[in-house]
Amino acid sequence: MINIVLFGPPGSGKGTQAKFLEEKFNLKQLSTGDMFRFNLKNQTELGKLAQSYMDQGHLVPDEVTTNMLRDELKKHTGYSGFIFDGYPRTTTQAESLDVILKEDLGQEVKICLSLKVDDEVLVGRLLERGKESGRADDANEEVIRERIVEYYKKTDEVAEHYKAQGKYAEVNGVGEIAEITANLSAEIEKFV
């Protein structure tokens, strides 16, 4: 199986690339955001627990997010692996993912891919996306810059986790979409 952690700051094209990688390698993208929305909307036990923390203005503990992920992995069979999007965000989550994959699937993360894009390019892309989509979080340059800073704060420690395992690669996220996909695929194929 090919299990990939996909990193990319807001506006890096991560969602677009994940779709191409899903098709090419028969993978299932697991997005933390999608998992949260499903559990909250459907009032699952984990969704109610997460909501109780959010209602108090607290971050949802790693354990709750990890349990959502574990449940999600059980739902999807018949794929050649997974693309983890938005998880792990901390070293604790990365270590939990290692354990879950080993215990539940007898697998491991093969590679952590990070799309690299200059901050000014990201800001430009997001402002343009904000005009097209009407998303408030993509319309304010100050908010965009804060999101980018927050992204790097959260992912730096996780990148170090995978670098220490020899499972980390950076790919230029600027250029033609097909070229970026080819570069990501070449990195994945080194581990297949």
Feature-to-residue mapping (PLM):
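Glycine-rich phosphate-binding loop of ATP-dependent small-molecule kinases
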Residues: 1-192
